[in-house]
Amino acid sequence: MNMHGRRRGWSLMVSGGLLSAMVCAFLLSGCGKSSEAEIAPLACLAGPDAYLTALDGAPDKVELSGGTKISDCLVPRQSGGELATIGADLVAAATTLNSNAIDDPSGPSSLRAGYLLGAVEKAAWSSNGIHTDLVRRVSAAASYIPQGDDPSLLQPGFDQGLEAGRSRG
């Protein structure tokens, strides 16, 4: 093969590679636009204390600032960063409520922990599975019972809150 044949072959390979890359980029750019991340309300990013304050109204009126329900914080196609931030805040709030409920089982924290879990479950039902792990984490944090303690320690307040959160969360 002469020198021109090698150049021509190389030129076709480079052009073919560029064409393939351009087609892939075009197809991927179209895909990204149809599945853009949804954004949760700003009130959902106010930290765990905002959730704890809102839960003071459980089992009745539980709202973050601006009338935002806890279930509104978990949206379909949520970005990973936003989900991580909101998820950490929800788990922190659930952990605080659980600790308070263990210290005072007859107090309101058990009901509030149940409500929080119910609201997270409600949101997760319509989010195509992206919040499944968060539901498990909030459930573990909200319903934790230390080894050796009575498993019914948090009931019935927890169950009442759970049902309220699932329906009104």
Across the structure, where does each feature detected by a protein language model lie?
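Extracytosolic low-complexity repeat regions of secreted or lipid-anchored proteins
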Residues: 94-169
